[in-house]
Amino acid sequence: MTEGERKNMKQDTLEGRAKTKNGVKRLCFSAVCILLEAAFIIAMITKLNQYAEIINLMTRLLAGVLVLKLYASDQTSSMKMPWVILILVFPILGVGLYLLIGLNGGTRKMRERYDQIDRELLPLLPNDSECRETLGRKIPKAGNISDYIQKNASYPVYQNTDVIYYDEAVKGLEAQLADLAKAEKFIFMEYHAIEDAQAWHKIQRVLEDRVKAGVEVRVFYDDMGSIGFINTDFIKKMENVGIHCRVFNPFTPGLNVFLNNRDHRKITVIDGKVGFTGGYNLANEYFNFTHPYGQWKDTGIRLEGEAVRSLTVTFLEMWNAVSDKDKNDSDFTGFLVQTDYQAKQTGFIQPYADSPMDHEQVGEEVYISMVNKAEKYCWFMTPYLIITDEMSHALCLAAKRGVD
């Protein structure tokens, strides 16, 4: 490592500490505001103590209704049980919290906005019945899962797409940088966490160069995921160099009915022809530039060909959903180009995304279906293993069948 690299790393470390401190301050301030709101609610309840018997009766009746609603819902048991216990043990607190954040469906205005964008975007996805039939004929089990994805998430299956798998995140980053430098029309990037440090600076330099060449660059990130990594002036800094930024569900100092919904997508789209996705965010620890949790193991994939269209639609859906209509795209067709790429590989590719506006757990259902249909082996690679009871049961059952 050269002296200059050491100085840059030291500078990134100091800046990282400052950003973490800034994020902690934001969290603390927001926590204090939420506590004050909670204290106000408790004070109001105390003031209404003279109506305690009536309030208590109504709360218990409502608690019973909510417990029955939860029991009949299609949520997983790991999602139901904490709410059921909280509501039964602490009815007033449990009912209040559930009505505030447990419904997890967003506001009516937000739902209408998502629905409107989906009505405009989803019809632009191809509907290749021949491709579906070919998959179903060649691999019936995969065909069934593919049909489920298309029916419940609206994303189709493709051919004519080449895939490269990266067993380390840093390899994916290197390939990503090389492809970003070749962008001619647009670059879309959507990530749960962005850290304004070494890894991002490598990307930012390429993005700034592409902006000067007339390329439209959009960056989208989750506020909670990035809260300890970037300062509040990050968007202003990016806009000053021509990089357009938007934030998903900003963390505000107050109770928020949509707070529990976070954007965990990791997507890069280049000219609608090349796409990257996988498990890594754009933060130093994912590429082992820093080691706060030891050696980090994550993966990524590169797509080139027709299947990139679904990644483009996924990005445009969320980008337009979080902003006012007058700032949104009036025409999506300019980003959904027809590719003349001829793939070397002959497999089937189906990128898909889940929606925060419904209760269908598409991602989990796909994994459970894959495990249930496995005959020889079922291998997963993830730095996180936080699974539901249903997923755990599926894995155990597969192991009992002799699946590795």
Describe every region a protein language model picked out.
Residues 2-365, 369, 373, 397:
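N-terminal localization/anchoring segments of enzymes in phospholipid and broader phosphate metabolism
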Residues 90-93, 382, 403:
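Hydrophobic alpha-helix-in-membranes signature
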